[in-house]
Structures are given as C-alpha cells and as structure tokens.
A protein has these predicted regions:
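Class I SAM-dependent methyltransferase SAM/SAH-binding core
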Residues: 2-49
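A short acidic, Gly/Pro-enriched loop at the edge of an enzyme's catalytic core
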Residues: 47-59
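A short, conserved alpha-helix within the catalytic core of class I
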Residues: 68-77
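Conserved catalytic/acceptor-binding region of the Class I
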Residues: 78-146
Length: 174
C-alpha cells in the first residue's frame, strides 16, 4: 500500500519490510517511509515475497488480503515465517450509518474506478476459514471512531486503490 500503517508500525523496534507489487502504491510507500532506517520497501507479492526462509516474526496484511491468491500466499507465509509466529489480517470496515457516512459512500460509488470489484473481493477475502483451514485462528473486531480534517479525508480517499489517480481526467469533477 501507500505506507500509512507501515509508518506507524515502524515505531516498534525491529526491521519492517513492506511488500508492494504496484509501482504507484510502492512509490507512495517509499515517500511515506523516507528517512526511516528500519524500513525497506520491496517490489514483490504476497505469493512471492523474495524473503529468506524462516526470516519473519510477524506478517501483517492491512487492506490487502483480497488481492492475494490465498493458497499460494499461505504457502509463502509458511515458508518465510519463523516457527510459531503469527499472521495478522486487517480490514478497516467503513460504517455507513450517519448522513455524512452515507453521502461519503455515495461519493465513493460515483467516482471509484473499480470499487464494486474490490468490495466483492474483500467479501471473498473475509472467508478466513478457507485460508487457515485446519490451522487455528482468532478473529477480533475493534470498533473505533476516526476524526479527520478535510485534508486528511482527502488524502485517505485518494489513497484507496479503487479511486482515480491524481492525473485521472475525472479528478477535477470530484
């Protein structure tokens, strides 16, 4: 992704390796993580990370699992994880209950490039039983409110993979 979560995780001790196959998203991540000596960003995929066997303490997939080939990603995760280490699969699920949230969802539906496809993939990705199969997993949900300035909301909106790029002709209409 764009490195938003990676920036926060980089505050933890240890090395952080971000995997991003998309050139534009990876470029944003490199900019976001610039100057952080414990971070590196790789041009790779969840299914082929290029990392060494048994080299990773924790894998965190934030807003990305729906892009993976689950079977191949699981094999890769098992290869790179150290023994008895963990995988965290994270989604931010946006509420659409208030008038503002409903209007924002309508805005996204109007201007997004492939939002319906991404939402369909996210739903499929939520079936963690298939990914973990006989391995045990724990599901936790945390409810939280986020208060954003207009600039923060704009930045978040433009960071979604399904929203137009900054050079897209529809951007001025947004």
């Amino acid at each position: 992704g764009t490195g938003i979560l990676s920036f926060e995780l980089a505050k933890w001790p240890g090395e952080l390796i971000a995997i991003e196959p998309n050139d534009e998203m990876r470029g944003k991540a490199v900019d976001t993580l610039k100057g952080l000596s414990n971070c590196k960003v790789l041009n790779a995929t969840a299914e082929k990370t290029t990392l060494s066997n048994n080299s990773v303490d924790l894998i965190i997939c934030a807003q990305s699992f729906h892009w993976f080939n689950p079977g191949k990603a699981k094999i890769e995760f098992q290869r790179i994880l150290k023994k008895n280490k963990k995988v965290a699969i994270i989604w931010n699920i946006r509420s659409a209950e208030t008038d503002f949230e409903k209007a924002y969802e309508d805005f996204i539906l109007k201007y997004a490039i492939d939002y319906i496809e991404v939402k369909r993939r996210e739903f499929r990705g939520n079936n963690l039983d298939q990914f973990f199969k006989s391995d045990s997993y724990e599901e936790k949900m945390f409810i939280y409110d986020t208060y954003l300035t207009f600039q923060q909301l704009l930045g978040r909106t433009l960071s979604y993979s399904y929203m137009p790029n900054l050079d897209h002709p529809i951007l001025p209409a947004m």
